[in-house]
Regions:
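FIC/Doc superfamily catalytic core
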Residues: 1-328
Length: 328
């Protein structure tokens, strides 16, 4: 008989799937957003930062951005290596097949390059999850790992449950098996994303790990309670809620930014913005000379830029300066 991971599909889970499916439709519209490529880059950096921070990597998001941009960064060499490895693994994400065990091993080989001896190979020794000195989870024996992982991938291929549920169940079962010597947390989170992007490609760019990091204690509670119940239902609910919250947060952020980005800026307004960039203290009289239009028209254009949330006045009218909030 084939393996069936224990979990229940509750009314709460059905409701969350419905909400996520609707929200995914909304987020797909961001493909046409002028900020689309920038948003992808931002989210990839957030994903890598958060997934590694959960594993106690102390590098800041600014340091990680610098590493990704090829700049030199002062820091723990192992932590810097973790960032470089994670970037390589996530860059491979779109080519990974969620049903292929060999792809999981390929991703682990990259993720743990120069960090462990058995990168890309299942562990050959016992491992446990510790809270201080206390064992909170003792993983199955090493000689069982290849069979347990084969069963899990077989279930993933053959199950007809919704991909959102499958991704959560796989994530939980993967963490329970703890198939690798190290890197199990970041690989479990990566593989959930791989499963989800095979359902809807937009998931390749959603920083779900960021909200997991923000709710790290709840993440571990959901894993532990599912261990206690021998049933992953609690973990499924936690992860689905996290996925929904991630999408909602992105939509909310983009709704605030997009109207400003989509505002039509005239040629004269562009000249005004360039002048403000050069000198935030520039006066309307000076702008009149720079742009070549009457001071009255400068005033009208400045008001329009303020109304559209593109510039704001900082300080008093007489001695203050101009600040550009959002550019075209």
């Amino acid at each position: 008989m084939s393996y069936e991971p224990p979990f229940k599909i509750t009314s709460q889970i059905i409701d969350l799937i419905s909400q996520i499916s609707e929200a995914v439709g909304e987020i797909n519209s961001l493909e046409n957003n002028p900020r689309h490529l920038e948003l992808r880059k931002e989210n990839r950096i957030k994903t890598i930062h958060s997934s590694l921070a959960i594993e106690n990597n102390s590098l800041s998001i600014e340091q990680i951005t610098a590493i990704i941009e090829g700049k030199r960064v002062l820091g723990n060499p192992n932590e810097i290596q973790e960032v470089k490895n994670a970037l390589q693994a996530y860059e491979l994400l779109l080519t990974l097949n969620s049903y292929e065990e060999k792809d999981l091993l390929k991703a682990h080989k990259l993720m743990m390059n120069d960090l462990v001896e058995r990168n890309g190979k299942y562990r050959n020794e016992g491992v446990g999850v510790f809270d201080g000195k206390q064992v909170v989870h003792l993983a199955p024996p090493a000689d069982r790992v290849p069979f347990l992982m084969a069963d899990l991938f077989q279930w993933l291929k053959n199950s007809d449950v919704h991909p959102l549920i499958k991704s959560c169940v796989f994530h939980y079962e993967f963490e329970f098996i703890h198939p690798f010597q190290d890197g199990n947390g970041r690989m479990g989170r990566l593989w959930q994303t791989v499963i989800l992007k095979d359902w809807k490609s937009v998931f390749a760019w959603l920083p779900i790990e960021t909200l997991i990091k923000e709710n790290q204690e709840e993440y571990y509670k959901a894993l532990n309670s599912s261990d206690s119940n021998a049933d992953s239902t609690n973990f499924i609910v936690f992860m689905l809620q996290t996925i929904l919250n991630t999408i909602k947060e992105i939509l909310e952020t983009e709704k605030k930014i997009t109207p400003k980005i989509n505002v039509k800026i005239t040629a004269n307004q562009k000249k005004i913005l360039e002048a403000i960039k050069q000198n935030p203290f520039v006066t309307q009289e000076e702008l009149s000379g720079i742009v070549g239009i009457a001071k009255l028209n400068i005033n009208k254009n400045m008001k329009k830029l303020q109304e559209n949330g593109i510039i704001e006045r900082v300080g008093a009218d007489k001695n203050g300066s101009w600040q550009i909030k959002t550019e075209e």
